[in-house]
């Protein structure tokens, strides 16, 4: 901008009157209009602090906003009016705060209008060939994006006005920028909901933090619970399953009752001796027998004798017993302690189950005895799972022996068979008695006949008597 003329720096009253002629008209004094222009130019000069610029006034006017009123013009008296005087009367000479407020109002109106009615907003995307294509998007997403762009442009405009305004009297626009930022923060949940493709929208706190994961719990309460949503558990049943409680007691009622709590996954077990009361849901395990057999250690004398015998093949074959031949592992079991445990359980779905456990070092042998066919089938199907569970506890288990004990059925069947045999024996004895009574007179007659045959005819009668005796069975 060009510096003002020296005559404009002086007051209008002290300046000598200038004669202006327009198209040969006589000279006339400048009126109130000229004095107003001169006063405005002086105020503008004092505000800028005597700044000067070597650039062209037209270029400065375009850089300040492209306002046509900033270009030097000719006044009604034929003289050029300086650009600074024209800028003083232009609307851009308002304070920066007023211009920022105006910009914010314009941005708010732009947000309210949005897209015209009946139009579908489009989003730019790239197809497989890499070319940009326009695809329709959801109205909420398009409106949210338009909101963000409008607010960002408004902030840039306000910041640009603050940066270009170099006057010392310029007012700060921090409040305006804060208002725009608050509007942007308020629009953040809508933007997050629009940009979320599927599933549940991200919480507002995650959007503000710039994180992709769920919002962190504050005060032990997660945002989902605070919003009223029900938290999901890992198993989907609404809660973890309780531990199973077992109560061990002797069959004769003596000794102390031991309670064991085992987690559902079998990873944790707690044994307590003080819990002796029977509670609902507790499975009772009756201990029938618990013994411990101490193995006999082989002394030095026995070892030396055994070594000498084993060195002679003849003695070894002669003294080797049949037990050692059939069970060669029996020699290696010397000196080991054997623990046996026999328990009885009453599961609801299996009936009575008797388990016999034999533990020697880490080797465990399990025998299960059941009384129903359904229990036998279920345990046989779960045999491999039981072996895996015992091996996970550190035991060396080859297999679990399951025995079907139909003792009750066989006993009842044997009793019926013995009763039938007794009844048949009683009937046989009755028939034998009847036969004896009928044969007694015949035997008496046969004896008389034999005696008579012995006296008179000894040739034919003895042969007939022998034939008759050969066909009878005597009890």
UniProtKB/Swiss-Prot annotation:
<dbReference type="GO" id="GO:0097588">
    <property type="term" value="P:archaeal or bacterial-type flagellum-dependent cell motility"/>
</dbReference>
<feature type="compositionally biased region" description="Basic and acidic residues">
    <location>
        <begin position="427"/>
        <end position="449"/>
    </location>
</feature>
<feature type="compositionally biased region" description="Low complexity">
    <location>
        <begin position="79"/>
        <end position="100"/>
    </location>
</feature>
<dbReference type="GO" id="GO:0005737">
    <property type="term" value="C:cytoplasm"/>
</dbReference>
<feature type="compositionally biased region" description="Polar residues">
    <location>
        <begin position="9"/>
        <end position="22"/>
    </location>
</feature>
<dbReference type="InterPro" id="IPR021136">
    <property type="entry name" value="Flagellar_hook_control-like_C"/>
</dbReference>
<feature type="region of interest" description="Disordered">
    <location>
        <begin position="1"/>
        <end position="175"/>
    </location>
</feature>
<dbReference type="Pfam" id="PF02120">
    <property type="entry name" value="Flg_hook"/>
</dbReference>
<feature type="compositionally biased region" description="Basic and acidic residues">
    <location>
        <begin position="143"/>
        <end position="155"/>
    </location>
</feature>
<feature type="region of interest" description="Disordered">
    <location>
        <begin position="195"/>
        <end position="243"/>
    </location>
</feature>
<dbReference type="InterPro" id="IPR038610">
    <property type="entry name" value="FliK-like_C_sf"/>
</dbReference>
<keyword id="KW-0145">Chemotaxis</keyword>
<comment type="function">
    <text>Required for the rotation of the flagellar motor. Has a positive effect as flagellar rotation increases when an excess of motd is present.</text>
</comment>
<protein>
    <recommendedName>
        <fullName>Chemotaxis protein MotD</fullName>
    </recommendedName>
</protein>
<feature type="compositionally biased region" description="Gly residues">
    <location>
        <begin position="408"/>
        <end position="417"/>
    </location>
</feature>
<keyword id="KW-0963">Cytoplasm</keyword>
<feature type="region of interest" description="Disordered">
    <location>
        <begin position="408"/>
        <end position="475"/>
    </location>
</feature>
<dbReference type="GO" id="GO:0006935">
    <property type="term" value="P:chemotaxis"/>
</dbReference>
<keyword id="KW-0283">Flagellar rotation</keyword>
């Amino acid at each position: 901008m060009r510096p003002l003329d020296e005559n404009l720096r002086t007051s209008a009253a002290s300046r000598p009157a200038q004669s202006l002629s327009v198209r040969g008209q006589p000279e006339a004094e400048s009126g109130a209009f000229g004095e107003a222009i001169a006063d405005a130019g002086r105020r503008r000069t004092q505000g800028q602090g005597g700044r000067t610029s070597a650039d062209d006034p037209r270029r400065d006017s375009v850089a300040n906003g492209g306002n046509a009123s900033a270009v030097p013009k000719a006044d009604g008296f034929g003289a050029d009016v300086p650009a600074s005087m024209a800028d003083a009367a232009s609307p851009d000479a308002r304070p920066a705060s007023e211009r920022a407020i105006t910009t914010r109002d314009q941005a708010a109106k732009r947000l309210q209008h949005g897209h015209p009615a009946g139009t579908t907003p489009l989003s730019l995307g790239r197809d497989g060939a890499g070319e940009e294509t326009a695809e329709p998007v959801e109205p909420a997403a398009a409106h949210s994006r338009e909101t963000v762009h409008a607010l960002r442009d408004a902030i840039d405009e306000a910041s640009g006005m603050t940066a270009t305004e170099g006057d010392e009297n310029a007012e700060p626009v921090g409040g305006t920028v804060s208002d725009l930022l608050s509007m942007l923060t308020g629009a953040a949940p809508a933007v997050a909901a629009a940009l979320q493709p599927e599933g549940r929208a991200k919480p507002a706190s995650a959007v503000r933090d710039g994180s992709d994961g769920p919002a962190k719990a504050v005060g032990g309460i997660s945002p989902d619970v605070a919003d009223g949503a029900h938290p999901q558990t890992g198993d989907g049943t609404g809660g973890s399953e309780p531990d199973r409680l077992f109560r061990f007691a002797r069959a004769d009622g003596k000794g102390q009752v031991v309670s064991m709590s085992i987690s559902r996954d079998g990873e944790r077990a707690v044994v307590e001796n003080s819990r002796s009361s029977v509670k609902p849901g507790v499975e009772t395990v009756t201990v029938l027998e618990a013994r411990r057999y101490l193995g006999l250690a082989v002394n030095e004398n026995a070892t030396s004798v055994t070594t000498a015998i084993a060195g002679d093949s003849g003695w070894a074959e002669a003294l080797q017993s049949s037990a050692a031949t059939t069970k060669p592992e029996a020699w290696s079991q010397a000196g080991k302690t054997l623990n046996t445990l026999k328990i009885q359980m009453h599961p609801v779905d299996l009936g009575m189950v008797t388990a016999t456990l034999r533990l020697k070092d880490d080797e465990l042998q399990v025998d299960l005895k059941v009384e129903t066919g359904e229990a036998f089938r279920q345990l046989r199907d779960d045999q491999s799972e039981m072996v895996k569970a015992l091996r996970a506890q550190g035991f060396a288990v080859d297999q679990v022996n399951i025995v079907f004990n139909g003792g009750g059925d066989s006993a009842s069947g044997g009793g019926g068979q013995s009763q039938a045999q007794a009844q048949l024996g009683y009937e046989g004895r009755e028939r034998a008695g009847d036969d004896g009574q009928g044969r007694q007179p015949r035997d008496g007659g046969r004896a008389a006949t034999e005696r008579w045959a012995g006296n008179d005819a000894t040739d034919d009668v003895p042969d007939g008597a022998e034939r008759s005796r050969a066909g009878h069975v005597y009890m």
